[in-house]
Design a protein with these regions (language model features):
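N-terminal Rossmann NAD(P)H-binding glycine-rich loop of SDR-like oxidoreductase domains
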Residues: 3-25
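NAD(P)-cofactor binding segment of oxidoreductase domains
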Residues: 57-98, 102
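Mid/C-terminal beta-alpha module of Rossmann-like enzyme folds, strongest
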Residues: 194-251, 291-295
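Conserved C-terminal active-site "lid" loop/helix of NAD(P)H-dependent oxidoreductases
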Residues: 219, 244-273
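Amphipathic terminal alpha-helices
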Residues: 277-295
Length: 295
């Protein structure tokens, strides 16, 4: 199938693009500049240089495709992009896979797709855009909701890996808040697999949470990182005000959410089988270990 893809050179997109190609799909990536276009071509896909807020361009590319996967989601992009895609795909029944985010659900010890929304300020803009995709007539619109994505030494896990370590005779790694909050997590390659499954088999109007099933606390992750960094597992809590000052109020509010999720629906409905290493394993002996050892 011919797929229009945004965000192809981003963190998640860099795993989605090769997986789509491996599955035999033809991919056209909408990218912002020629340097990104060359990366896409080198990977074996076609590229169009343009702006995701160019409604006429997006509608034409969507019309020419067999469906769309939108990874480059943003508050300043989504309203125009979604409207253009729905225009281009109108009445076709073709798939449109949009990107959500786990923070939309707020603090919750057992997040499922139908859990109530309680987003932090940072992601409050998502709801209306997701509703537009899920409620579209004549389009097989679905939303993949990544939890905190990690892997390949990148992603939000770097806020733990690169956290301040203090000084003195017994330096300690700085936590985010007191570290008691759980994070729902998923490996980037597992997220990529779910996007492909949602495109191929996802049902119209459905949401699929991408959660690998491990929900460690930030303190647990911090202690592992502190051991890998040669700090004997020493960590230091900080106040909410300190976290906000260090990371910015918006990101701090989101990272302080206490969230747990399992991703059960995607497993049952789409046959998704996340099998990437856990974030804990990645910190101890995987893709984040070299940075911890040398920081």
């Amino acid at each position: 199938m011919s797929i229009l893809l945004t965000g192809a050179t981003g963190y998640i997109g860099s795993s989605v693009l090769p997986r789509l190609l491996d599955e035999g799909h033809a991919v056209t990536a909408l990218v912002r500049d020629e340097s990104k276009a060359q990366l896409v071509r080198d990977a074996g896909a076609a590229a169009v240089v343009g702006d995701a807020t160019d409604g006429a361009l997006v509608a034409r590319l969507a019309l020419e495709s067999d469906g769309v996967i939108h990874l480059a989601s943003g508050h300043d992009v989504d309203p125009v992009f979604i409207a253009a895609v729905l225009d281009g795909l109108a009445g076709s029944g073709k798939p449109f896979v949009h990107t959500g985010g786990i923070w939309t659900y707020g603090s919750n010890p057992d997040i499922a797709e139908d859990s109530p929304a309680a987003p932090p300020a940072l992601t409050a803009w998502r709801g209306a855009n997701e509703a537009a995709v899920l409620g579209a007539d004549g389009v097989r619109g679905s939303v993949v909701v990544p939890s905190i994505v990690y892997g390949h030494g990148k992603g939000l896990a770097r806020v733990i890996v690169d956290a301040p370590r203090g000084s003195g005779v017994a330096p300690a790694l700085q936590l985010i808040g007191d570290g008691s909050q759980h994070w729902a997590t998923v490996h980037v390659d597992d997220v990529a697999a779910l996007y492909v499954l949602a495109f191929e088999n996802g049902a119209a109007g459905e949401v699929y949470i991408a959660a690998g099933g491990a929900n460690p606390t930030v303190r647990e992750l911090g202690e592992l990182a502190a051991r890998a960094a040669g700090l004997d597992g020493r960590v230091e809590a900080e106040s909410v005000a300190q976290t906000s000052a260090r990371l910015g109020a918006g990101l701090a509010e989101a990272l302080l959410l206490d969230q747990q999720a399992r991703g059960t629906k995607a497993r049952i409905d789409l046959g998704w089988e996340p099998n990437g290493p856990s974030l804990a394993d990645e910190i101890v002996s995987g893709s984040y270990a070299p940075a911890l050892a040398h920081n």
